[in-house]
């Protein structure tokens, strides 16, 4: 265990929307330090979402935020070894980790999707998550189902 907790790095808001969550998402999306490429993919995906949901009263950024909220898990299971047996113990997730998990899942399942460009795949996954569908939403439901099934072991909390 380390002695001092590392300092939180300050993340600057993105240039278009002025939102820190967007920058965090783009940082997860980025490969090999290519941040401009990641930003162009993200903004391209939001443009595609805007064209698909042009009749909605919500903006593309609001749809993205709602999609993230829809795929954010509340509980997860952690392995805990007790007396030779390993139990899956359901635990609450702290807010920063919730946000991180939801962003990583959205990106992971967008990458696994069939489609032309990454912007297309990301836009499709955002729209699905907004409508409570898609692989990222299914992942959240599976996490909740696992926690519910192992609720009997909740007293083994960490």
From Swiss-Prot:
Could you identify this protein by its name? Answer: Small ribosomal subunit protein uS7
Molecular-function annotations in GO: rRNA binding; structural constituent of ribosome; tRNA binding
Q: Which organism is it from?
A: Porphyromonas gingivalis (strain ATCC BAA-308 / W83)
Per the UniProt record, the lineage of the source organism begins with:
Bacteria, Pseudomonadati, Bacteroidota, Bacteroidia, Bacteroidales
What Gene3D superfamilies has UniProt attached to this entry?
Ribosomal protein S7 domain
The UniProt entry's sequence similarity note says: Belongs to the universal ribosomal protein uS7 family.
Q: Which HAMAP family match?
A: Ribosomal_uS7_B (MF_00480_B)
| Role description | One of the primary rRNA binding proteins, it binds directly to 16S rRNA where it nucleates assembly of the head domain of the 30S subunit. Is located at the subunit interface close to the decoding center, probably blocks exit of the E-site tRNA.
Which cellular component appears as one GO term in the record?
small ribosomal subunit
Record keywords, A-Z: Ribonucleoprotein, Ribosomal protein, RNA-binding, rRNA-binding, tRNA-binding
Which GO biological process annotations does it have?
translation
The cross-references to InterPro entries, in alphabetical order and at most eight, read:
Ribosomal_uS7, Ribosomal_uS7_bac/org-type, Ribosomal_uS7_dom, Ribosomal_uS7_dom_sf
Q: How does it assemble?
A: Part of the 30S ribosomal subunit. Contacts proteins S9 and S11.
């Amino acid at each position: 265990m380390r002695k001092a907790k590392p300092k939180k790095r300050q993340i600057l808001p993105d240039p278009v929307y002025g939102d820190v969550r967007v920058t965090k998402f783009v940082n997860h999306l980025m490969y090999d330090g290519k941040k401009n490429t990641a930003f162009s993919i993200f903004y391209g995906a939001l443009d595609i979402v805007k064209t698909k949901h042009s009749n909605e009263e919500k903006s593309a950024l609001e749809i993205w935020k709602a999609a993230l909220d829809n795929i954010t898990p509340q509980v997860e299971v952690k392995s805990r070894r007790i007396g030779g047996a390993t139990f899956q113990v359901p635990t609450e997730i702290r807010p920063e980790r919730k946000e991180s998990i939801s962003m990583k899942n959205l990106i992971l399942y967008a990458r696994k999707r069939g489609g032309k460009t990454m912007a297309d795949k990301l836009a499709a996954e955002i729209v699905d998550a907004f409508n409570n569908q898609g692989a990222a939403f299914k992942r959240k439901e599976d996490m909740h189902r696992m926690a519910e099934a192992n609720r009997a072991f909740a007293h083994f909390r960490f």
